[in-house]
């Protein structure tokens, strides 16, 4: 593998395992266009290499906290009224779900909003005991249109519905009971190594054929794509929602709080 320097992620290869670490400590590990582009670049490289396992990791305190409101705010202040399409992010999650490698989310700390898209899209999700999971979008008049097809596929409609409406974090224990997390332990690094000991034995061709077969059994995510992208763009282009985001970034106040 060629040595490449990235702005938003750290990447390392260890035999047949690729580790992608979200690394935006200055932005609470939120998602921006560069992070999406860089992750797609690495996954494309993994597809044509000997990589059989891709591990996603974050910072110790936050795995991924969703959309970068600061970046969205800057776009709005520059006069951009129409929100950009989230198709690259949706495609990234679909690659994690269907690509010819086993994908693992190794979660420590907080996961919010779009961060749940990563967790839901991966084949396996493990965590330590500090992990928590939330969907905060409705607090801003939004909803997780692009996350929901992946989350519903993972934990079912009602639990995803409940998480969306309540907007509050669930613990790693609840996440495990709901099937969002497959395994958790205080020593999640050890837990990850145990998983990799088994997964390293799988060959790439077998993984690719199996994941193609699994994808053929359920077309929910691909069918929902156009509807989810349209809904997301409409929400982020709505003037009232934009004002709520601007106010939150400038003052730290939520939409329901008094001026």
Swiss-Prot record:
Pathway: Antibiotic biosynthesis; bacillaene biosynthesis. One of its GO terms (cellular component) is cytoplasm. It holds the Pfam family ECH_1. It is an enzyme of class 4 (lyase). Keywords: Antibiotic biosynthesis, Cytoplasm, Lyase. Involved in some intermediate steps for the synthesis of the antibiotic polyketide bacillaene which is involved in secondary metabolism. Catalyzes the dehydration of the (S)-3-hydroxy-3-methylglutaryl group tethered to PksL to a 3-methylglutaconyl moiety. This is Bacillaene synthase dehydratase PksH. It comes from Bacillus subtilis (strain 168). The lineage of its organism: Bacteria, Bacillati, Bacillota, Bacilli, Bacillales. The gene is pksH.
């Amino acid at each position: 593998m060629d040595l490449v320097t990235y702005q938003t992620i750290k990447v390392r290869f260890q035999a047949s395992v690729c580790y992608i670490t979200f690394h935006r400590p200055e932005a609470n590990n939120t998602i921006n266009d560069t992070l999406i582009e860089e992750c797609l670049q690495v996954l494309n490289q993994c597809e044509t290499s000997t990589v059989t396992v891709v591990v996603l990791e974050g910072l110790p305190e936050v795995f991924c906290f969703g959309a970068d409101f600061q970046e969205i705010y800057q776009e709005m202040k520059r006069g951009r009224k129409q929100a950009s399409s989230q198709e690259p992010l949706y495609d990234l999650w679909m690659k994690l779900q269907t690509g010819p490698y086993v994908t693992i989310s190794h979660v420590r700390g907080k996961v919010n909003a779009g961060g749940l898209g990563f967790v839901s899209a991966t084949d396996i999700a493990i965590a330590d005991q500090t992990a928590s999971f939330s969907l905060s979008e409705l607090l801003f008049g939004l909803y997780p249109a692009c996350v929901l097809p992946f989350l519903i596929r993972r934990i079912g409609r009602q639990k995803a519905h409940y998480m969306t409406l309540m907007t509050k974090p669930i613990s790693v224990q609840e996440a495990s009971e709901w099937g969002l997390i497959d395994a958790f332990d205080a020593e999640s690094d050890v837990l990850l190594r145990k998983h990799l000991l088994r997964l390293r034995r799988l060959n790439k061709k077998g993984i690719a054929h199996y994941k193609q077969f699994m994808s053929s059994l359920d077309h929910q995510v691909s069918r929902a794509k156009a509807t989810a992208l349209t809904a997301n763009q409409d929400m982020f282009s709505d003037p009232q929602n934009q004002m709520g985001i601007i106010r939150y970034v400038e003052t730290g106040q939520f939409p329901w709080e008094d001026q």
